[in-house]
Amino acid sequence: MEDTGSIKQEAQSHPPGIFEIPGEPAVVINGVPDEPQTDCMIAKDEPISSGTVGSGEWLEGREVRKFFLGRYYSGTVTKFDKQSGWYRVEYEDGDSEDLDWSELEEVLLPLDTKNSNTNAQSEYGEAGQRVNVKAPYPGHKPEKLVTTTVKAPYPGHKPEKLIPLVDDILTVGPEITSEEVGRAQGIFASADQNNFGLLMAFNFVFTKGEFSGSTVSMYGRNPIFSKVREMPIIGGTGAFRFGRGYAQAKTFTFNTTSGNAVVKYNVYIWH
């Protein structure tokens, strides 16, 4: 957590062990401000490789879309400067600007992977560490569906609902060849009559590595066309017993032909 100001103890306004952080509510457990535990398989000081998200030249050619003064402008990432870490973006109207990664991430469009071998990836995430969820593979049957029938509540409503059953691969990195560390198992279903929102019920099941035998359970609403979607972590087993927290999902790539997507999950768990 970045420092937002000096931490001071107010003996008069707060009991001993209660600390006030300017601009934030005091949250204390045994006299220590509570912070989420976010163990990560990839060390924070590990050098960033050229294949890491937001790391450089491989983003050249990616498309962007920016909202400015009441309209959207489409553009392309044309150059990455290694020394400054800035990305040059040229827009359809002839204008251009230099953006850092945090700014570029805000306008970067999902990558269409329909002509790429990365089709085999469906989800990318971090559940206490960096993991991948991959869907289609040889022998995989994507048409695993539960069909239910409900009474149509309004004209034009489609009574048949399809609920995909998910049993996908968890890997250390986004590459197809990355080491498998577990499975992502669960269901999702359309659960919004007005917008495209899903009900997600997922278990991240770790079968290898430090968290082998442990699971993390995620359950909540996923408005998949929103830029960032937040869902609750409602529990866990093994290393994540009594776990609680939240997950933030962000679409990284989407295949318009197969429907497969790569989604980055940042998961924060108190346990």
UniProtKB/Swiss-Prot annotation:
Pfam families: Dirigent (PF03018), PTM_DIR17_Tudor (PF21743)
Keyword set includes Cell division: no
Domain of life assignment: Eukaryota
UniProt keyword annotation of Methyltransferase present: no
Keywords: Apoplast, Glycoprotein, Secreted
Signal peptide stretch: none
Paired cysteines (S-S): none
Main localisation: secreted
Location of region: Disordered: 1-22
Bias kind Polar residues: ranges: 1-12
Location of the protein in the cell: Secreted, Extracellular space, Apoplast
GO biological process: phenylpropanoid biosynthetic process
GO cellular component, one term: apoplast
Residues linked to a glycan: N255
Stated role: Dirigent proteins impart stereoselectivity on the phenoxy radical-coupling reaction, yielding optically active lignans from two molecules of coniferyl alcohol in the biosynthesis of lignans, flavonolignans, and alkaloids and thus plays a central role in plant secondary metabolism.
Family: Belongs to the plant dirigent protein family.
UniProt cross-references to PANTHER family, sorted A to Z: NUCLEOPORIN-RELATED
Assembly description: Homodimer.
Record-given protein name: Dirigent protein 17
Higher taxonomy: Eukaryota, Viridiplantae, Streptophyta, Embryophyta, Tracheophyta
